[in-house]
Amino acid sequence: MAKLIKCINSAAGEHFSVYNGDCVSVASQFPDETVGFSIYSPPFQNIFTYSDSELDMGNCASDEEFDAHYQFLIKQMYRLTKPGRLTAVHCSDLPSSKWKDGVIGLKDFPGDIVRAHQAEGWIFHSRVCVWRDPVVEMTRTKALGLLYKQLKKDSTRSRMGIADYVLVFRKPGDNAEPVEQMPENFPVSQWQKWASPVWMDINQTNTLNVRMAKDNADEKHLCPLQLDLIERAVTLWSNPGNVVLSPFMGIGSEGVSSLKLKRKFIGIELKPSYFKHAVRYLEAAERQESLFTIEMASDETACEIAE
């Protein structure tokens, strides 16, 4: 990625390059078939607002508008990925609301993602269900279907909690560089655990500190991926030295995990405050500083942003 990339801002270390800008615009400038693996969490249609930027995919008038915008990125990800290699997309079912959708229920966002990738030539490779605590969801969202009083009143309106999913897609073609797992580093007992269609042991609180990325001007939602989930995917589907890409870098979770596992990282993030703190995390990861140390420093910065 030696060419000059047109973007708002950029930063680089020995093993990472990150860009502040629109993910489709920036990704379109990268060379073909240079990415060994990608993992990211896209905006969940227009459920959450991440910023006020008109370039933000989350700022869309409808699900159809989001799908059209997201399709451009999927096309770029296909072009960038090496043949036989994978992309992993974190997502979940989305709640529908009476005021917006006409009914209270769920929308099949994972299904939309699968169909969108298949339309661009990706092969649907795997789906992992990531368990989430329904009590935490009920406490946070007060969703009618999870309330005990609704169960007592009329349990036909009661539902299960919403799980997370990791959808994995493979680019057709032969993989020129097999990802070989050695028994001394990846015993069969570990594979039996990871091969489960449901990952029950992902620690939902094992995330980078998010307080420092708050921007009072437009911050509405921030939910970084769990580090153990990222590390599991990167270990399973890439080799040390491979390039790992995240087009929705956020505060740098995928990058920190990739550097920890001796991969190279390329990230794109639209929001300047997220980008700024992602750079801090990535620089600290290259120096192998304690994440606790950089979080403490970032908390001080959060106070500066809020003032």
Briefly describe each language-model feature range:
Residues N20-S25, E295-A302:
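Conserved SAM/SAH-binding loop
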Residues V279-M296:
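DNA/chromatin major-groove-contacting recognition/catalytic segments
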Residues A2-H277, E307:
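Core catalytic lobe of class I
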Residues S290, A302-E307:
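Short, intrinsically disordered terminal tails adjacent to the first/last structured region
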